[in-house]
Curated annotation (Swiss-Prot):
Its main location: cytoplasm. This is Eukaryotic translation initiation factor 2 subunit 3. One of its GO terms (biological process) is cytoplasmic translational initiation. The keyword Acetylation applies.
Amino acid sequence: AGGEAGVTLGQPSLVEQDSHSGFKNELERDGGLLLIAGNESKLKHILILGNKIDLVKESQAKEQYGQILAFVQETVAXGATVGQVLGAVGALPEIFTELXIVNIGSLSTGGQVSAVKADLGKIVLTNPVXTEVGEEKSVEKHWRLIGWGQIR
């Protein structure tokens, strides 16, 4: 599926659980959460962004900042800028809606979240990927989105 075809994701607001249980903050983003392995050697110019920062107390925000710095220490993300995404819904620059890497089987491609409705999100792929309609896959390998997708 590629071009206007897309991957429909189940549960677009997703939370990391098992392998990083020490990182206890609940992380959500409308449309999904992309977690990048800290040992991914090809990444450069990393920004670590959080949202909904206005919903926590200043002391909690400082504690979370420290947890993030400790979490990425001795990884390719050590020294990365840590900041927050602030802005009214629909008022953020377009780049914040285009941060998706999608694994389908053993293939990876870019994608853009084009729609979110209830517990489904639609991602339009940037390049064609060979697969079959109805195929269900867990997202895996280096780029991980906690959850699953079904080709439609």
